[in-house]
């Protein structure tokens, strides 16, 4: 972890928790006082299943999901979520009893695209946007814009951690939120109080992880 000030936020599930470090962290467009490490939730099957089980409860009874659009390396969680939403023990809203799991290509920091062979999995489909976190919301906003551009309908937004319950006019459902991390702060990179106090940045962070400075 990027700092020694780390802790785990536990849930009722023994294999589902949030590992965080407190410090001064920078992304490409914001600064925060916590680094939230979700590497194991994204990569370890048992934890990805636990995340999927939690998120499934928001959509299994009343939401049609044809496609799960995975951002930030969430393909393992997305596959587990698709499996849960189409399993026999849940009431399934999907007419075809199956779900596409796709990822977009990034043109630049604010635009996403789908190749011609992927477009049919978006166009005319109910698309659930799945992200690691929703903090500034820029990546999710780009995903929502892309889904609409390619003729899809946004079915909802889901994430492991979110600081807001709404983004681009859609409800955000998450496993963890500020109630689990009440002193979490996210600032614009040019208006960061930690920078103004002269506090050094501990690490650069993005959806892939961290790099200590």
Where are these regions (language model features)?
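A contiguous pocket-lining binding segment that forms or flanks enzyme active sites
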Residues: 113-159
């Amino acid at each position: 972890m990027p700092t020694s000030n780390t802790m785990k936020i536990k849930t009722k599930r023994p294999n589902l928790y949030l590992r965080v470090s407190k410090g001064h962290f920078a992304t490409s467009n914001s600064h925060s006082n916590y680094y939230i490490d979700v590497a194991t939730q994204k990569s370890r099957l048992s934890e990805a299943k636990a995340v999927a089980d939690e998120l499934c409860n928001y959509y299994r009874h009343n939401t049609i999901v044809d496609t799960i659009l995975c951002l930030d390396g969430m393909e393992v969680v997305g596959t587990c979520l698709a499996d849960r939403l189409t399993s026999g023990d849940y009431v399934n809203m999907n007419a075809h009893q199956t779900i596409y799991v796709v990822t977009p290509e990034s043109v630049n920091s604010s635009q996403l695209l789908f190749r011609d062979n992927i477009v049919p999995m978006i166009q005319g489909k109910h698309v659930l946007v799945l992200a690691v976190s929703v903090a500034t919301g820029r990546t999710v906003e780009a995903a929502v814009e892309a889904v609409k551009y390619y003729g899809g309908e946004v079915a909802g937004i889901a994430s492991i951690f979110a600081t807001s319950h709404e983004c681009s006019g859609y409800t955000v459902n998450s496993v963890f939120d500020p109630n689990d991390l009440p002193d979490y702060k996210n600032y614009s990179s040019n208006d960061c109080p930690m920078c103004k106090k002269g506090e050094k940045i501990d690490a650069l962070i993005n959806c892939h992880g961290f790099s200590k400075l």
